[in-house]
C-alpha cells in the first residue's frame, strides 16, 4: 500500500491512505538538493529537529519504490509501554521521504531488560525486514514462556493461576494414571494432580513471593556482572536430582529468619514458626477394594510417601535458618532423615487411635491388614507401639520440636562413617539445633514442674528418637526389597531418596578397595547400627539393582576403586568406568 499525494494550495499536502485522508503542512523545500547522484548516502534529518535515527529509519534512494512518497518503517514497536507513540513528518523535497520520528529507547531504560532483549538488525534482513533474537525465561512447570516470578519460581500466567486456585481452595486432585503424567505446554491441563505435584517439586510455595521484586530491575542495571553470569548458565533438561535441588533452592529472602536473626529470636516465636510450618494432612481419594493385597497396600503407601516428600521439602524450607544453609547441606539433611520425619508424623497422627495407623484421612490400616505384606508385620508392631507417646502425653509443641531435631541431627556425625561428605557448615546446623532444643526446654519449663521433672521429661522425649531411628532402618530395608522385587511402582522422588540412602550406607573395607591396592594401607569404615541390617545384605541388595549377582560377586568387588583420603562419595554403577567420585 502506497500513499497518494495531492498538492493543495498554501503548501498543504494531503496524503490519501486506504483508511482515510491525512492533511499535513509541509515545510518550504530547501533551495539546494539533499542528495547527489554521485553519492549513495541516506537522508538524515537535523539532529536538533528529530534526534538520532535508528538503523530501521534509514532508506537508500536507489532501493525505494517509484512513488513520490517513500514510506520507511520505524523500529518494531514491541509494546505501547516500552515505545511511545510515533509522530510522522512529511518532507517535501525532490524525493520526499515519509519517516517515523520514533527514537530508540536505551536498553537500560526498557522494562524487563533481564528477561527480554531484542536486537534489531539492518533493514531487509530476514522475514519482514528485521532480525529479532529473543532470550526469555521459561516456566519451571510447563516450559512455556514465563510471565514473571510467582510463588518462588519463574512461571507462566496459567501455572501461576492454577497454583493460586489450588492453595486457596479445591486441591484434592486425583491422577487417573500413575502420578507420572508429563506436564508441558500442551498437556498441562490433562492432569491437575500431576501439575500440582510438579508445582511443589519445582519449588512453588505459598509464601514464595519475593519482597524485593520491585527493585530487581534497578539492581540488575547496576550489576552487569551478575546479569552476565545468569545469562551464561547452561540450559539443559533437568535430571531428577536437579529437579529436587531446584525445588529446594529458592530465594533466601522468602524464608523466615536467618542465622543472624536466630540469635535474637525468642523461643516462643520459634515454636510459632515450627507450628506454622506443619504440612496439611493428605487425602488419597483412591478407592481400593478390601481386603487389601500386598501390591494394593504398597501402591497406596508409596504413593502417599511420594506426596508427603513434596510437602516435607516445603516444611523444611520454612524452618528458621534452613534456607541460609548451602544447597549441599539441605539435600544431605533431607536424604538422611526423610523416612524418620515421615514416621514421626505417622505416629503423631495415630496417637489417639490405639491399634490403628492413620496414613491419610481416608487410609487407616490395622495390624491384620498389614500382615498381607511380607515383612510389614514387624514394622506395624513397632509403629503401633505409640503407647510410649501416649503415656508421655506428647504436646503439639513438643512434636514439632522433635521433628525438627530429627532433621537437623541426621547429618551431625556423618563424617564418622566416612561414606558421605560432611556438612559444609556444621556450625550453622548445630546453631539451629541448639535453637530448637532451647525452644523445647522453654516449653517444658512452663509445665509448672520442678527442675528435676523438667530434665527427666526432656530426656524421655529425646529417647523416643532412637526408637524412631530403628523403625526407619527397618522400613528402609523393606522399601529396598520391594524395589528389587519390582512389584510396585516407585515414583521419582521416592526412588531418588531411597537410592541416596543406600549410597550413604557404610560398607566393609573388603568391598571398598580393589585388588591392585593391596600394598597400600587401608582405612576401615565403621559399621553403624543406624544403617539397619548386615553389611553383606546391604551389599548384595545394592548389587541387585546396578550390578551382577550370585557368581559374579568377585568381579563386582574388583571393579571398586580405592578412594583417596579426603571428603568424597564413591558411587558404583556396575563397571569400572561407572565408578565415579563426587567431590
UniProtKB/Swiss-Prot annotation:
Record-linked SUPFAM superfamilies: Glucocorticoid receptor-like (DNA-binding domain), Nuclear receptor ligand-binding domain
Zinc finger (NR C4-type): 139-159, 175-199
SMART domains: HOLI (SM00430), ZnF_C4 (SM00399)
Low complexity: compositionally biased ranges: 539-551
Keywords: DNA-binding, Lipid-binding, Metal-binding, Nucleus, Receptor, Steroid-binding, Transcription, Transcription regulation, Zinc, Zinc-finger
DNA-binding region as annotated in the record: 139-204
Annotated spans, Modulating: 1-138
Secreted listed as a keyword: no
UniProt feature coiled coil, ranges: none
CDD domains per UniProt: NR_DBD_ER (cd07171)
InterPro entries (alphabetical): Est_rcpt/est-rel_rcp, Estr_rcpt, Estr_rcpt_N, NHR-like_dom_sf, Nucl_hrmn_rcpt_lig-bd, Nuclear_hormone_rcpt_NR3, Nuclear_hrmn_rcpt, Znf_hrmn_rcpt
Cellular compartments per GO CC: nucleus
Molecular functions (GO terms): hormone binding; nuclear estrogen receptor activity; sequence-specific DNA binding; steroid binding; zinc ion binding
Stated family: Belongs to the nuclear hormone receptor family. NR3 subfamily.
Its biological purpose: The steroid hormones and their receptors are involved in the regulation of eukaryotic gene expression and affect cellular proliferation and differentiation in target tissues.
Record comment regarding domains: Composed of three domains: a modulating N-terminal domain, a DNA-binding domain and a C-terminal ligand-binding domain.
Protein name: Estrogen receptor
Native source species: Oreochromis aureus (Israeli tilapia)
Underlying gene: esr1
Amino acid at each position: 500500500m502506497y500513499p497518494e499525494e495531492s498538492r493543495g494550495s498554501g503548501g498543504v499536502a494531503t496524503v490519501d491512505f486506504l483508511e482515510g485522508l491525512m492533511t499535513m503542512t509541509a515545510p518550504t523545500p530547501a533551495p539546494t538538493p539533499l542528495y547527489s547522484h554521485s553519492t549513495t548516502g541516506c537522508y538524515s534529518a537535523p539532529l536538533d529537529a528529530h534526534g538520532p535515527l535508528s538503523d530501521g529509519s534509514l532508506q537508500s534512494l536507489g532501493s525505494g519504490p517509484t512513488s513520490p512518497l517513500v514510506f520507511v518503517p520505524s523500529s518494531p514497536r514491541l509494546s505501547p509501554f516500552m515505545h511511545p507513540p510515533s509522530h510522522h513528518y512529511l518532507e517535501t523535497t525532490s524525493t520526499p521521504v515519509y519517516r517515523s520520528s520514533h527514537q530508540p529507547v536505551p536498553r537500560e531504560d526498557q522494562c524487563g531488560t533481564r528477561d527480554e532483549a531484542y536486537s534489531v538488525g539492518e533493514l531487509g534482513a530476514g522475514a519482514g525486514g528485521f532480525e529479532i533474537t529473543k532470550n526469555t525465561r521459561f516456566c519451571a512447570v510447563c516450559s512455556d514462556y514465563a510471565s514473571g516470578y510467582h510463588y518462588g519460581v519463574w512461571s507462566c500466567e496459567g501455572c501461576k493461576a492454577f497454583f493460586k486456585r489450588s492453595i486457596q481452595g479445591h486441591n484434592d486432585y486425583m491422577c487417573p494414571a500413575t502420578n507420572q503424567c508429563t506436564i508441558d505446554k500442551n498437556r498441562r491441563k490433562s492432569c491437575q494432580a500431576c501439575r500440582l505435584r510438579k508445582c511443589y517439586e519445582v519449588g512453588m510455595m505459598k509464601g514464595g513471593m519475593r519482597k524485593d521484586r520491585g527493585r530487581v530491575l534497578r539492581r540488575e542495571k547496576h550489576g552487569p556482572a551478575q546479569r552476565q553470569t545468569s545469562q551464561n548458565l547452561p540450559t539443559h533438561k533437568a535430571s531428577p536430582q536437579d529437579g529436587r535441588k531446584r525445588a529446594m533452592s529458592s530465594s533466601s529472602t522468602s524464608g523466615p529468619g536467618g542465622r543472624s536473626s536466630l540469635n535474637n529470636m525468642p523461643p516462643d516465636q520459634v515454636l510459632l514458626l515450627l507450628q506454622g510450618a506443619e504440612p496439611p494432612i493428605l487425602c488419597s481419594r483412591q478407592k481400593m477394594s478390601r481386603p487389601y493385597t500386598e501390591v494394593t497396600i504398597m501402591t497406596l503407601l508409596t504413593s502417599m510417601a511420594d506426596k508427603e516428600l513434596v510437602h516435607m521439602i516445603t516444611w523444611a524450607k520454612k524452618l528458621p535458618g534452613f534456607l541460609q544453609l548451602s544447597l549441599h547441606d539441605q539435600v544431605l539433611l533431607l536424604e538422611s532423615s526423610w523416612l524418620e520425619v515421615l514416621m514421626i508424623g505417622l505416629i503423631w497422627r495415630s496417637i489417639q487411635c490405639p491399634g490403628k495407623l492413620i496414613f491419610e484421612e481416608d487410609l487407616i490400616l490395622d495390624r491384620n491388614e498389614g500382615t498381607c505384606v511380607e515383612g510389614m508385620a514387624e514394622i506395624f508392631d513397632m509403629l503401633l507401639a505409640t503407647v510410649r507417646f501416649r503415656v508421655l502425653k506428647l504436646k503439639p509443641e513438643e512434636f514439632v520440636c522433635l521433628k525438627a531435631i530429627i532433621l537437623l541431627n541426621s547429618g551431625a556425625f556423618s563424617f564418622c562413617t566416612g561414606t558421605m561428605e560432611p556438612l559444609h557448615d556444621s556450625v550453622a546446623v548445630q546453631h539451629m539445633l541448639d535453637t530448637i532444643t532451647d525452644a523445647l526446654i522453654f516449653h517444658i519449663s512452663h509445665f509448672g514442674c520442678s527442675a528435676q521433672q523438667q530434665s527427666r521429661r526432656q530426656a524421655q522425649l529425646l529417647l523416643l528418637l532412637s526408637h524412631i531411628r530403628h523403625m526407619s532402618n527397618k522400613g528402609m530395608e523393606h522399601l529396598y526389597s520391594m524395589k528389587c522385587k519390582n512389584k510396585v511402582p516407585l515414583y521419582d522422588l521416592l526412588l531418588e531418596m531411597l537410592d541416596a540412602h543406600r549410597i550413604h550406607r557404610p560398607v566393609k573395607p573388603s568391598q571398598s578397595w580393589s585388588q591392585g591396592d593391596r600394598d597400600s594401607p587401608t582405612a576401615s569404615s565403621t559399621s553403624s547400627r543406624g544403617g539397619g541390617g548386615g553389611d553383606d545384605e546391604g551389599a548384595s541388595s545394592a548389587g541387585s539393582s546396578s550390578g551382577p549377582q550370585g557368581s559374579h560377586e568377585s568381579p563386582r568387588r574388583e571393579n571398586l576403586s580405592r578412594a583417596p583420603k579426603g571428603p568424597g562419595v564413591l558411587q558404583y554403577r556396575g563397571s569400572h568406568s561407572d565408578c565415579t567420585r563426587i567431590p
